[in-house]
């Protein structure tokens, strides 16, 4: 048992400091007087930490009472944080702000910025709603029920523009969590503000940087936890419960003892992600520049599901005089979401619950594809046969059409900064103009879902397939009585003009 007290450099108690036994989850926090007690192992080492202070690791060997002084992390406190009306040092901020540096995010194989930020800012809930390629996450600040306001380089944008950013081009992300911090944005900031600052040029020789990554993943467990023989046993038990004879005998159990038709073998795959980013950063006393190109390619867990994103950014600033500066920030992105056609979930809905419902408990007793002699195969180039649902999910996914959506966004920001210090010391003014062009193109192509009627080998063994009868055809169309193609195009643009007058003393 060890006891002690944690104070700062002035001798004031630190309330809520963390004391953790290194290498374990055993720990405690200091009380209102800075005191603590903790049971630890022999010769243990404890780690003492608190936000804004430098961590300390202390050996407990030969000692049971500790007086610990934590020193301020001056580097963290001097760090500049972007707020609604400019920048401030962390030590001067009284409002509630959480900051995330993006160096740690750049190698995470996530499809968008929302997903990479999960768990990295206190008071910010980031929840993924779907595992489809390109799917985003919801962001809620301090338990609010609506989206926060998104501000990118001083321009109010929507969640889609935030998600379209490449983590490599982002300098930092700040979450303004209370009314005092977000007040400059008015009522639209009632659910908090997410402030994003993209990278800019620095005073150095041209520095070229190329980053690439590749990752893949697999399921930790099978989606269907039953076999064909277990399904036969279940159906027999249902019949007995209803007072009927068991419909399936030993011959079928013998036939299925080494085979099961798993729909997931045809519709699921191991997803993969590759990312590439090329940038150049440099500048002189007069001009600074940052140029970047990004590419993200993601293959989803379902076949025929993928997401691609292309990004570019050009951020150039020039000092016309010692007091007058111009900055031009041009960026663009294109996002391609491609997937199979399934009309019973929303056109832009990443929560494909109806598809999941339709495939989750699919029978293990019927093959999906056979050759001409009726031998079961897993080859989608073979002959599709009718399933119990009246439609053919693998054929729909692999050969039944598509729904492809493309988004493109081009944004230009120009800013003029003038230092008026020769008239009033600490006075500056800025004018910022912004224009964006956006388009969306959604194309859906629907094919007939064609299959052949399942032919059993005999009337007594209805699950054992026989040769295909090519005169017995079934067609299930998902939208109408004919094949069709549909295309929707949306075009929009926006502009914004801001004027700032700042005084800092």
Where are these regions (language model features)?
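Short, solvent-exposed loop/turn segments enriched in Ser/Thr/Gly
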Residues: 113, 409-411
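Surface-exposed loop/interface segments of Gram-negative outer-membrane beta-barrel transport/assembly proteins
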Residues: 202-260, 300-307, 311, 315-409, ...
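Short, small/polar-rich motifs associated with maturation and membrane association
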Residues: 1-313, 321, 325-327, 331-333
């Amino acid at each position: 048992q060890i006891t002690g007290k944690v104070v700062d450099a002035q001798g004031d108690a630190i309330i809520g400091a963390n004391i953790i036994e290194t290498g374990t989850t055993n720990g405690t926090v200091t009380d209102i007087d800075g005191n603590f007690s903790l049971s630890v192992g022999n010769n243990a080492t404890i780690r003492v930490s608190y936000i804004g202070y430098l961590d300390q690791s202390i050996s407990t060997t030969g000692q049971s009472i500790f007086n610990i002084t934590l020193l301020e992390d001056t580097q963290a406190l001097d760090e500049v944080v972007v707020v609604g009306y400019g920048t401030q040092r962390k030590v001067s901020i009284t409002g509630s702000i959480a900051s995330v540096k993006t160096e740690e995010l750049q190698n995470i194989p996530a499809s968008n910025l929302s997903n990479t930020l999960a768990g990295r800012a206190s008071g910010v809930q980031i929840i993924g709603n779907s595992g489809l390629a390109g799917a985003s996450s919801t962001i809620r600040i301090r338990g609010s029920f609506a989206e926060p306001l998104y501000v990118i380089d001083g321009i109010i944008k929507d969640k889609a523009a935030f998600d379209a950013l490449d983590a490599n081009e982002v300098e930092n992300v700040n979450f303004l969590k209370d009314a005092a911090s977000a007040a400059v944005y008015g009522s639209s900031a009632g659910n908090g503000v997410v402030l994003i600052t993209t990278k800019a040029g620095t005073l150095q020789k041209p520095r070229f940087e190329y980053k690439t990554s590749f990752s893949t993943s697999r399921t930790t467990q099978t989606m269907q936890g039953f076999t064909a023989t277990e399904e036969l046993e279940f159906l027999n038990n249902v019949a007995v419960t209803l007072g009927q004879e068991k419909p399936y005998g030993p011959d079928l159990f013998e036939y299925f003892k080494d085979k099961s038709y798993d729909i997931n073998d045809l519709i699921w795959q191991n997803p993969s992600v590759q990312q590439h980013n090329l940038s150049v950063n440099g500048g002189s006393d007069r001009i600074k520049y940052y140029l970047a190109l990004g590419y993200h390619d993601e293959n989803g867990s379902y076949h025929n599901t993928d997401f691609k994103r292309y990004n570019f950014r050009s951020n150039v600033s020039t000092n016309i005089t010692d007091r007058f500066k111009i900055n031009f920030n041009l960026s663009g992105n294109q996002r391609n979401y491609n997937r199979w056609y399934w009309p019973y979930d929303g056109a832009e809905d990443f929560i494909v619950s109806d598809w999941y419902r339709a495939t989750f408990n699919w029978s293990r007793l019927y093959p999906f594809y056979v050759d001409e002699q009726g031998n079961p195969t897993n080859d989608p180039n073979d002959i599709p046969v009718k399933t119990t649902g009246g439609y053919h999910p693998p054929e729909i996914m692999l050969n039944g059409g598509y729904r492809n959506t493309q988004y493109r966004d081009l944004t230009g920001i120009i800013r003029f900064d003038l230092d008026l210090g020769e008239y009033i010391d600490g006075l500056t003014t800025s004018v910022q103009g912004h224009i964006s062009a956006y388009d969306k193109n959604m194309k859906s192509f629907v094919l007939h879902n064609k299959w052949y009627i399942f032919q059993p080998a005999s009337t007594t063994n209805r699950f054992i397939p026989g040769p295909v009868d090519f005169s017995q055809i079934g067609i299930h169309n998902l939208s109408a009585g004919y094949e069709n193609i549909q295309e929707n195009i949306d075009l929009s643009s926006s502009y914004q003009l801001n004027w700032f007058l700042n005084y800092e003393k």
